[in-house]
Amino acid sequence: MKQSILTLSLLSALALSSCQRDLDEVSPQSTPQPTESNSPSTPARTFLSTQGAEAGTLYIRIRRSAKNGFRALDAGGASMQSLPLQLAKSLRSIGTEYLEPLFPMDPRFEERIRREGLDLWYIVHFDKKQNLQSAMQTLSSVPEVEYTEPAYEIAQPTGKPVPVNYIGRSDAPAAPYNDPLLPDQWHYHNTGRFSRSIAGADIGLFEAWTKETGKANVIVAVDDGGIDIKHPDLKDNLYVNQAELKGKEGVDDDNNGFVDDIYGFNFIHNNGTIYPDDESHGTHVAGTVGARTNNNIGVAGVAGGDGTEGSGVRLMSCQIFGGKNEGGSGARAMYYSANNGAVISQNSWGYVLKANITAIPQADKAAIDYFIKYAGCDKDGNQLPNSPMKGGIVIFAAGNDGMDYKSYPGAYPPVVAVASMAPNWTAAYYSNRGDWVDITAPGGDTHFPQGEVLSTLSEKITGKEYGYMQGTSMACPHVSGVAALIVSHFGKKGFTNVECQQRLLGALKAQNIDALTGYKGRMGRGYIDASAVFAENKKKAPAKITQLHIDDVSFTTAHLSWLAVRDEDDGLPVEYNLYLSTEKITEANAKDALHTKLNATGYAPGKKITLPLNALHENTTYYLAIEAVDRWGLKSGLTLAQLTTKKNNPPVLTRSSEKKLRVSALTKESFSVTFSDPDQQKVSISVSGESRGVSYQISGDKILFSLRAVAPVGKYEITVTATDVLGAKTLLSIPFEVYTYKAPAFISSLGSHVVGIGQSTTLDVAPTLEKSDGVALTYKARVSDGSLASATINADGQLVIRGLKTGTTQVNLEVSDGISTPVQTSIPLRVVQNTSEPVYSVYPIPATTELNIVLNPATQRANIQIYSLTGVKVLDRDYTVGGIGKVKLLVKNLAPGAYTLRVQSAQGSYTKAFVKK
């Protein structure tokens, strides 16, 4: 049964998208029943990978409503023509040769088989040239078919056995039994006598044998290569179906649905002929579980008895591989063993790595669930009178890929998954790992002298009857053997698989598996200790943890620490449960919080245990609780704490200038954006939006931009995104425009102007110009005769002229956009004494032929008179002068002499003497 072990962090799951779910892929601890989904009843038509699958074979599960159409087929007396029309048509379309039930009906248990839906599973054998995915799609489209999956190839054993002679050694240490090779079975009792091995790196079997050696009423199904049924060290401990042994050949004498199944069954060829596989793998595995002990030959098995009659567990050979490319159904083998007395299912097999299986195949799931629920039971699920246990326990090797990944079927939560160790406590180099592994046992390591596992071999295959092999395949039967000791010792009416599994997974060596293997939380709870399975539950819970310390809290991480506690009756707890939630945790709601487990074995009471938490949310308050749990599931009670992570401030983006960005065919723009992070985190930069004509490079803490007019005329936007390592983002939008350029030009006159001394006038130059919209202009103003007036002009084109001395001059203007050649114009200027006077000037004096009178510009009409020195009026005339501002008098006919000029207008009266030459 799976437990989730906390590794170096609480994984990304601690992001707490929901606090109301489990971190663990685990079924409730009170039962080994499965929780993993991927149910065949799910309507979604998604298919498992077909890599590593057998060509021309599929498993299907039909709907219960369609079962009547298959009854004739089940009886073996009908062809596909008896099936529903559409199904028959689809089967023919893929070249189907025949169908057969995956789980042949056992009439003794028909009711429970139908209740669990195993009668709905069929194997479809069809043209091997057909594409498997297409065939699955074809069958899944049929209304009667509920689910379809490939039949995966079982990985063939690759390790080669190393045969040995079993001549007793004079230097062999004392052993409790007389099997000559027992002293060399270091995996049972390691004295450290082999080079680089460490004393105690074993399963503690010699001490366990003082309590139990195995009983014949315990049947262990060995789903593996065929066992050598003639092996002298195995033949007396084989399961024997007496009805078939004493019955007629070719007849199902015990009416269990299988013919001639004397020692088990061959699921490759579907007959009772058991033969050793090409590597003697099944024989080696069987020997570890239950080779006859104390019989003065060969080796001993974990639960092989003590040499007395009736001692030793019984080995049921469920052959699922044999020669090269030979494979049978592990699911069918498990189903068979559940119906025929086995209560422990030993499985040192898996699927090829290339199959890339990411979920338990549903046929395997159905068989495993069935074995766990019904092994040792009658048709109603009640314990059989002659069975030592109600329900079964399924044990799988973790696999030999040397990888950290979920290897199915072993990774299915309800089974016990076994990893492998070397003779010095380290993880065997080939062993798979993961938080789905439950426990570790010796599997051997060829890099150590005599460091592999010693067990039985088939002489027919290897030339010798004993030899070494390595693998999780060798570790797994140690655990199955220990489970067999548990059932042998405690088995009775009312003893359950839950109790067995609890004892099995709680029987651990004192060593710290996390520290010794280096794979924290990836090698299971610990190293199995056979001697610890007999401990008594005195109902005493572990001591409560005094305090949960929290240090080094950052935005997403924190460090936890606490002191290891003791357990009064068991010495140490087996694990610590850590709970995490954004809600306050209590004893009542702890089960709803995110939680995980940490191995407790190997941490002496008072030793400081530290644990980093990762993947927390920033600026969030978390509530934590921790408890110690012993092997019996008794808990210390919760110790509470809380923490609040630091607030993460987003990065800062700042533009070098806020001016509007405009580019044309003649212009480009350059600017920069500075980025920083208030929390001193690393910032990553991305630029999106318009890319035509936009180039940039990052230099230090600046993004240097250059804009050119590549995109069509229009308005565009660039977005700069700064992201810190925790994902906080800041976005800066930068608009820019592509426009058509127009050089500035004067399109109207500024006129001529008059200003009084000490007075000023203001002109708006900008409206007289034509230019490109949005282009800024610079202005310059200069008076030709600076003694007469001054001129200033601002950035908006407001020209201010101030009179200094009477006279006429001009103001010169220059306007530039910084792109084209500047444009110029001039403004005629007259400086008068006072601009409110009716006449600004009279000239020339003396006059000869004409006399010019410059009037106030506001004058519309004026009366002009000239008097001689004697007072004679020589001119009296009215002039309309609106808009002209000047009157020219012809005076050439006047006699030379002195005269007086008088001007009368709405602006006032004016008198001036002048001389006519």
Task: Locate the predicted segments by residue.
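C-terminal outer-membrane/trafficking sorting elements
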Residues: I5, T835-Y843, A847-K917
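Inhibitory N-terminal propeptides of secreted protease zymogens
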Residues: P28-I167
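Protease zymogen maturation seam
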Residues: R108-I123, Q137-I219, I227-D233
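Acidic-leg catalytic submotif of subtilisin-like serine proteases
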Residues: P143-E146, I198-N271, H284, T288, ...
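Extracellular S/T/G-rich loop segment that most often corresponds to the catalytic His/Ser-adjacent loop
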Residues: D224, S407-S488
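Subtilisin-like peptidase catalytic core
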Residues: G225, G247, N255, D260-A366, ...
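C-terminal subdomain of the subtilisin-like protease fold in secreted/lumenal serine endopeptidases
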Residues: L238, A342-N347, I357, K390-G392, ...
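Recognizes extended acidic, P/S/T-rich segments that occur
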Residues: P573-H617
